[in-house]
């Protein structure tokens, strides 16, 4: 699930720490500057310059950013209103933070960071999809037992799909299936009867195959539409590379919604 709550009080500021400075985690640091009720006083990354870069992208002057090697140094910096960068993510666990956002992109590290944060009474936002799909359910159970919140991060395809499914169910609709836009793009070149695929692959279509990709117009002939769709799917299933991102993201959705993965290579 994606955790949501009632709006927090106008004068409440959530203190959160970020581990990892990939694209998504860095976006949290930069966007926090536009959210009065969110403060990111500390960022951890094994590459200190990457952590500094996150604050630079957020418009924070270098004079306001310090590097800390110990908890005492980090705490002193936070208390003085500085932005702190550290190489050791475990320094965040014993600081006055309510939430840890884990964004290393490493499944094992993400699991250990999240488990440690929960042990130290921190809520956890899991950005690392590789961790969420493997042990997210277990971490969520631990959080619930401790009276804490563990949630996947909002804003990416899995969370948006989960939210849509939840909304449909809340208004009484039965959800039969769910899906997302695949990571692999296929470009249909009808004039030249070609399909352009990933890794610079091109497939020349026979006329009968090319006809499958013409717009389906004309009388509302259900059997024709179904037949054409099935034939398209049969052709594409032989060509599409299954991307890890697709498997991970739809695995997250399946875990969160109780929809099952019907086919190992997914439907396309």
What are these regions (language model features)?
Residues 1-116:
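N-terminal glycine-/serine-/threonine-rich beta1-alpha1-beta2 phosphate-ribose binding loop
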